[in-house]
Amino acid sequence: MSELTALTIAEARDKLKAKAITATELTDAYLSAIDAANDAINAYVAVTHDQARSMAKASDERIAKGEAGALEGIPLGVKDLFATKGVHTQACSHILDGFKPEYESTVTANLWADGAVMLGKLNMDEFAMGSSNETSYYGPVKNPWRAKGSNADLVPGGSSGGSAAAVAAHLCAGATATDTGGSIRQPAAFTGTVGIKPTYGRVSRWGTVAFASSLDQAGPIARDVRDAAILMKSMASLDLKDTTSVDLPVPDYEAALGRSVKGMKIGIPREYRVDGMPGEIEELWQKGIQYLKDAGAEIVDISLPHTKYALPAYYIVAPAEASSNLARYDGVRYGLRVPGKDIADMYEQTRAAGFGKEVKRRIMIGTYVLSAGYYDAYYLRAQKVRTLIKKDFEDVFAKGVDAILTPATPSAAFGLADEVLANDPVKMYLNDIFTVTVNMAGLPGIAVPAGLNGQGLPLGLQLIGRPFEEETLFQAAHVIEQAAGRFTPAKWW
């Protein structure tokens, strides 16, 4: 069975088309793998066995009739942030206990319309707030990777930790994820997988539980660049239900792979060389530069002067939007309800019991920076910084730069329940240092595995592109992948 789960989406698609395997066989192989591994890895918070089998059966019937969709019979995992009709959707929070939506998110509806099969809902940081998947009400996810000669559990990154871990451990062929400040790219880098955050507005947010609405963007996590391109094509669409959705044709991203990068201008930002960055990250970056240079790309030094203000500005804008978005959870119509002596008390008791520590922290920060006395000092100033960050990128792209190459994370995956990080939220927030600028500017960014560190753990590089030019990112990421190879964890679970 494991040879079926080892297939990439592209390989499985070809075998299904050739009728060498059936969608039912493929789905059963994944369900068996999940049942065997999930107690150890905790990637899934709900497994939809019956629904998966009936979707696979319908796929087999369509294949037999010659009516196969672009993702026909491909088993996928769905981050618990996406509404799935009649299926557990709780953003991994206690406050949404028992919530099963009456509607389907646009992203998942697009995937099912193309014939994909749903295996279940994936673990994540509560309301997508976290960088280690330790804030989930359902407990942490364990990274399928371990350091050489060690049995210590590592985090898979966050907030899409379940998505990244499930893809790396072959518990789904690919997964949906979301990225508000790095939540697709950082877990992808920590697990040796590929993750792309599309341009803001490229993929619909409708039916995705909101964290910070001006920053949130859905995208795929997959085993390789080709699979990410295949998934992205199905996920992206114009959606009139999302006012930020952009009416642009969705290109065939897969067709961009293998195109030469000769003459492509790749920018290397000097501000991304941060103090205390491990030497292995700098080495990896140099390696990535060399891979692109060898393939004919032109490397240029660039400056993004406002980079150092991105993280503090992000941690004002994102919590401000979160405090507003999360005001809707009150225990009245759905989810958890804790009784109180009157309605105001019921609200307070429900929110006190329903939200976890990190979510409460961000709601309080957000409410504070939006309060009358501090709005100008914090929120307004952060929005001005955001405009300057966006302008930095615009200036660089105006000079003819096609894409920017940076590290994806400041380190490899760290230990589960790390006491230093648990006691210092700011240290945890520093995980997003290379990724938040991309969300602040609304640009596309892809994380691609580029090597292993001294302990045998995966490290990723990030490519940042011009708005709506994801094809360029797939093209350049494919070059890095071809040079670096693919990375799979040794099975311990």
Swiss-Prot record:
SUPFAM superfamilies hit by this protein: Amidase signature (AS) enzymes (SSF75304)
GO biological process, one term: translation
Keywords tagged on the record: ATP-binding, Ligase, Nucleotide-binding, Protein biosynthesis
Protein's UniProt keywords contain Mitochondrion: no
Family annotation (InterPro entries): Amidase, Amidase_CS, Amidase_dom, AS_sf, GatA
EC annotation from Swiss-Prot or TrEMBL: 6.3.5.7
Protein biosynthesis as UniProt keyword: yes
A GO CC annotation given for this chain: glutamyl-tRNA(Gln) amidotransferase complex
Active-site positions on this chain: K79, S159, S183
GO-annotated molecular function: ATP binding; glutaminyl-tRNA synthase (glutamine-hydrolyzing) activity
A UniProt-annotated Pfam family: Amidase
Reaction it catalyzes: L-glutamyl-tRNA(Gln) + L-glutamine + ATP + H2O = L-glutaminyl-tRNA(Gln) + L-glutamate + ADP + phosphate + H(+)
Role, per record: Allows the formation of correctly charged Gln-tRNA(Gln) through the transamidation of misacylated Glu-tRNA(Gln) in organisms which lack glutaminyl-tRNA synthetase. The reaction takes place in the presence of glutamine and ATP through an activated gamma-phospho-Glu-tRNA(Gln).
Family under the similarity heading: Belongs to the amidase family. GatA subfamily.
Oligomeric and partner information: Heterotrimer of A, B and C subunits.
HAMAP family, per database record: GatA
Protein name listed in UniProt: Glutamyl-tRNA(Gln) amidotransferase subunit A
Gene: gatA
